[in-house]
């Protein structure tokens, strides 16, 4: 029996939204999800800033599901009264609450490859995995990749770190790894290291946790909601501007980062310490299984279409 088709608006291919789309598509058994790059449709997985500022006023009375994530502040838009609006985190929900209503938080799922990978007997090959791309043009620095690499180099740990990025002296270019190789790369690290200024959700950190890899992370924004590992508390927050983009920047002290990195290094050589953190990370990641996502999406769509009166 052929699958029914559900056109899904995802505005890009080499981006985190496409990864979410692929992971969601794995969990659909009765519908075939087909990506639309061009315009919004009944099911949308997209950036909150781009979508709300460009489309929310046009589609404010259209029935649809809008599942959004962003690290950037949203400046304007309209309440999408007929839509079901979900965010990837409480952090994003709070950011857009004055623009549109939000029906709830819907966490992105990991790729099902993780469930095979987490049971594989893998030797740890490096202390840290770092994953992050910066927008082309160099005007926005959000992931702090080069800052991270400079600090690791200063501490003599650059050669014990695998970096997937598009800036700095990375080891692997972003969006080039097959999904199995990507999860294996994460699994081979003791810790996932992320020092981002802000994150709407943070797919790589969640993906690392899904194979039992804890994190060294900034204890703020979305990470504060689910990350397991060694936190770095920010000491202040500012709003940073880059052209038409604005984002919150959670400031961290170099010395606090160094101390967290040292703590991770020490934990990695203490079996009880590491196994405890790894088990907690893996257990926490189960909240991202999302096995009922098809039933939930289809039920929501049927409900809003049933109640729609043009």
Region locations from a protein language model:
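Conserved catalytic-core segment of nucleotide-activated headgroup transferases in glycan assembly
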Residues: 112-170
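Acidic donor-binding loop of glycosyltransferase active sites
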Residues: 184-200, 213
């Amino acid at each position: 029996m052929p699958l029914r088709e559900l056109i899904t608006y995802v505005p890009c291919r080499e981006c985190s939204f496409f990864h979410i789309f692929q992971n969601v598509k794995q969990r659909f058994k009765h519908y075939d999800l087909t990506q639309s790059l061009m315009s919004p449709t009944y099911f949308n997985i997209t950036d909150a800033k781009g979508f709300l500022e460009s489309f929310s006023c046009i589609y404010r009375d259209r029935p649809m599901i809008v599942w959004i994530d962003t690290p950037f502040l949203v400046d304007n838009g309209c309440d999408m009264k007929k839509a079901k609006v979900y965010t990837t985190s409480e952090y994003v929900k709070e950011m857009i609450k004055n623009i549109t209503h939000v029906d709830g938080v819907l966490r992105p799922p990991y790729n099902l490859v993780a469930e095979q990978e987490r049971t594989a007997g893998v030797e740890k090959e490096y202390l840290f995995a770092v994953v992050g791309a910066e927008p082309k043009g160099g005007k926005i620095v959000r992931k702090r990749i080069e800052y991270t690499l400079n600090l690791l180099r200063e501490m003599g740990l650059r050669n014990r770190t695998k970096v997937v990025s598009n800036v700095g002296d990375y080891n692997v270019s972003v969006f080039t790894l097959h999904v199995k190789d990507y999860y294996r790369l994460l699994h081979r690290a003791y810790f996932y290291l992320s020092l981002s200024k802000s994150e709407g959700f943070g797919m790589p950190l969640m993906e690392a946790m899904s194979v039992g890899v804890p994190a060294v992370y900034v204890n703020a924004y979305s990470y504060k909601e689910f990350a397991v590992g060694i936190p770095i508390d920010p000491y202040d927050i500012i709003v940073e501007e880059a052209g038409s983009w604005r984002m919150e920047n959670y400031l961290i002290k170099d010395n606090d980062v160094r101390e967290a990195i040292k703590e991770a290094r020490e934990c990695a050589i203490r079996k009880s310490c590491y196994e405890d953190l790894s088990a907690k990370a893996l257990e926490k990641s189960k909240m991202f299984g999302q096995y009922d996502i098809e039933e939930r999406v289809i039920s929501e769509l049927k409900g809003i279409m049933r109640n729609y009166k043009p």
